[in-house]
């Protein structure tokens, strides 16, 4: 019988041939025409999980051997475009010779159509009509067991038997993103940490808190329990460094194979043969491992294969070159995760109704369709300037919005998504051969598309309410976020439809707001608030139909921000999203006129909400707006020598300080480590956008404007870490808000002279500064020059203060000339043009005095 013959051969191979790092699945053995059998090698090994349970932790020497075996196995899989995706002790076996081996690839992911794949694979995939993308990852079998939080009942919070896989999942996977080679390296790091220290780097008895800890918290101190006899201090240092590089939450910064193999922690006589893999990368992976095995009797590798009885197709490990970037798959790779059955990518246009989706949810077979993207934001909100927010009709009608920046920018800083496989059909009807027929067809297609999207969001709203795993919900929320952040013009029409329908049919917004209130999972709240912020930030017009939900959200955010005092990492992430989404709502409402705001939205004033943001950094003062006495007539009079006597028009533009709240924003600008820089950035951007749409809001910032402006200068001057993109964006937003304050209260620019000199101001326009920062300060300089000219009387009599200012400005302009004009090839063209204008002004100096500027 074929089965018996195959059984004998496998048993003989196991007993007599080389020992593998990977137990392979043998080829299909055909018993008869209708039945296929999956034959595996008989295993006489010992479970590594049982070994750890008995011994708790490993010595350094044993850990080195363990690491070498597991790294060889993972490297072999990655070189063949396979992500193991479920590394944990129960999936590792130890044979009688002490060799550690991976036991199964049942949950692994095969990356198809990699650039290194042969033409046959490409041709096969091109013939697959269900695959519209040439770069795909396919889940080999079901991953439902991995996504369950608890081993027995996922909804039983009292059950502390947490699914073992959760401890080893990487932060990006727990956030709902796809697996990558880097995810396997993270899992290896957790495993190595557990083996050497005896405890997990992240631990909790509650599965939800465990997930939050992995995503947001720092790992525990890695303490070696059984160091070698010598150099235990050096070993500990190397181990600390290794763990810091493996357990890096950003997968783009996580250590890769070349650096991992040669890390000092693994440098000893037992692992010298591992380095041969790096030195001979021109050979195929199989050849490398065979050569490596010849240098050591403790390890060798063999090819692995698997077969599927459902498809009768085998997974073969091709002999191929090592991928160029083995640390992560192609960012354009799509992943299709299959549960129990192989389902093609779903398209709403291919279904008659959404019942198919509902059935998938009820049967727990929801197809998870997401993409591999650059995770470097958000993973927390990445400080990358997004495209300008689309102008809404209220914004376009504002005549007072002239500034150095032509438009506002989103408060929420996000990654920009370039491509995403849509679950929604995107029909572009551009052919107009027959006007009448085509118009009718276009209308019908548009109506069908709208109906599809409506059904799609009805399905999503229903799904969000279901009781399913956190990871599944996070996957769906991440898909929606990525969908709305698409920058590809190809999808602009579909995104526009999405936003219109989200606002017109408010079921999704209502359900999201409701989930924020009732959900006990902070990580889910973070994602939902983030999603709502993007919806509001990208919407040109919020429908009045969503009034109740938006107002509820506004009040919820206002109350949460006011009472927020928790500083752990997950709460900090929540606070960031609270502030950013709150800022997006305030910015949208600030674009509406007072009548629309009060009659349609029922909001008489935004002052309460703006003060909530200000109170994040409020310094208590005995004075308050309510206690401040009304200005007396004498207080409004000016002495004959004051500048106001010569320029009443200027003074009339300055609001009365006694009407302002007693606040100080100086703590925003200082480098106090207690202030989260991301929240600082969101806050400053909110203020900046409010000053664009409603310059009258300057009154909220004016009581200590002089101190505020000097603090802005100090912050921009002192922190010149140009490698930190977050710092750069803080500088840009700070200088922009700084300019708007000066523009609305020009006389405040005179205060810059008190604690400033030309070296400080030159620093503001230094070539190393971002060009937007330079432009803002050049505009401020122009205001400063203009004010000084306005204070020159008909007899060219200038008081001492203004004379000093003139001298300062002259010196500054001379510096400007030397700084910019002589280095015009090194500066931004816009900055050069602006600086050349100021150089022309320099020629109008006469006897250290200004000539009036018309």
Swiss-Prot record:
Known glycosylation sites: 32, 106, 163, 279, 283, 290, 325, 347, 365, 414, 520, 541, 620, 757
Source taxon at top rank? Eukaryota
Q: Which residues form the Protein kinase domain?
A: 1-266
Protein location: Membrane
Q: Which SMART domains match?
A: S_TKc
Q: Which Pfam families match?
A: Pkinase (PF00069)
Q: Which UniProt keywords apply?
A: Glycoprotein, Membrane, Transmembrane, Transmembrane helix
Q: Show the ranges annotated as biased composition (Low complexity).
A: 292-322, 633-650
Annotated segments matching region Disordered: 116-135, 289-331, 384-408, 425-446, 627-650
Signal sequence region: none
Q: Which family does it belong to?
A: Belongs to the protein kinase superfamily. Ser/Thr protein kinase family.
Protein name per UniProt? Probable inactive serine/threonine-protein kinase DDB_G0274821
